[in-house]
């Protein structure tokens, strides 16, 4: 975008955001319901925008702590997808980075905090990508569901 008065060029680069597939020892995924717009009431993964000076890994830890009260001990990068996040009348272009955070600990006491209305566990066969709020998350969910290496066989 070029300023017609001074000629300054502003490049519209995407804002980095993170989301986590939190997987318990039964290979269930933690799913959240959005408490606020955009897409209030729709399904989501815990996550959010990175802050200035923060790595994406630090953002994952911070967002999980804020939204579900849990800090992962390990995480693995899975994939990324571009997205358009409509907020306050503006289209915010994002690059959403997805991580897998597995845990063998008891996670039955996780509760929704911050901008999460509720959180609950779903087994692989219960997950429906089309019920998630954003296209990038639907694509990441679909990719995870199709890759058997992430799922424990019964």
Give residue ranges: language-model regions.
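Active-site-adjacent beta-strand/loop module that shapes the phosphate/pyrophosphate-binding cleft
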Residues: 79-108
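Charged phosphate-binding loop/patch that engages nucleotide di/tri-phosphates or the phosphate backbone
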Residues: 138-154
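Conserved hydrophobic "DFG−1" position in protein kinase catalytic cores
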Residues: 22-23, 31, 101, 121
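Acidic, metal-coordinating catalytic segment for phosphate/diphosphate chemistry
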Residues: 1-20
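Conserved Nudix-box catalytic region and its N-terminal flanking loop in Nudix hydrolases
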Residues: 24-66
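A generic structural micro-feature
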Residues: 12-14, 42, 89-95, 111-116
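NUDIX/MutT-family hydrolases
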Residues: 110-140
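A short coil-to-beta-strand element that immediately follows conserved catalytic motifs
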Residues: 70-80
